């Protein structure tokens, strides 16, 4: 397992298309640096799990390097779906301020299983601890079933 953490994003990304694109390019460069020495041909199954802007990077990286993989999209942003070409599953909170639910539903329609959490934010949290723990458990079960 390789974890890619992103650093150095500009302030004020949310709602600013130019800064969002800048953050995406920075993150993609960091992912390419971290993953650059991996010989992907050595692996039968590859799973990328992305969150937020990481979902855009995961899809773009897979597309750029022509990787066949399973893509888990946790709270994807709209730009993510420009790069998803293979097997994917998505999880979105209906109160996510970073992505409109209608846009996510439309982007997933007919091609990507989408699981909505009513009232959840960009962290799939609602503020109800019991509900959030149940959501986390259901999400993990769905991810496990998806990647098997």
Q: Where are these predicted regions, by residue range?
A:
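A conserved short beta-strand
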Residues: 66-78, 86-87
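Conserved alpha/beta-hydrolase "acid-adjacent" motif
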Residues: 82, 97-103
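Catalytic histidine-centered segment of alpha/beta-hydrolase-like enzymes
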Residues: 120-135
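Active-site signature of alpha/beta-hydrolase-fold catalytic machinery across serine-
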Residues: 60, 64
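Short, proline-enriched alpha-helix->beta-strand connector loops that line the catalytic pocket
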Residues: 83-88, 110-112
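Gly/Ala-rich beta-loop-alpha elbow adjacent to hydrolase catalytic centers
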Residues: 49-58
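Serine-hydrolase catalytic machinery in alpha/beta-hydrolase-like enzymes
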Residues: 1-43
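Short beta-strand/loop motif that positions the catalytic acidic residue
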Residues: 90-92, 96
């Amino acid at each position: 397992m390789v974890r890619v953490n992103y650093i150095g994003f500009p302030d004020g990304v949310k709602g600013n298309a130019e800064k969002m694109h800048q953050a995406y390019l920075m993150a993609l460069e960091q992912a390419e640096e971290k993953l650059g020495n991996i010989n992907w041909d050595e692996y039968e199954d590859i799973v990328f799990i992305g969150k937020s802007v990481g979902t855009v990077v995961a899809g773009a990286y897979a597309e750029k390097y022509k990787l066949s993989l399973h893509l888990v999209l946790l709270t994807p942003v709209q730009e993510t779906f420009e790069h998803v070409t293979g097997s994917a599953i998505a999880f979105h909170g209906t109160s996510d301020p970073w992505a409109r639910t209608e846009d996510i539903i439309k982007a997933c329609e007919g091609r990507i299983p989408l699981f909505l959490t009513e009232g959840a934010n960009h962290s799939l949290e609602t503020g109800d601890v019991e509900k959030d723990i149940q959501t986390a458990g259901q999400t993990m079960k769905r991810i496990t079933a998806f990647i098997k």
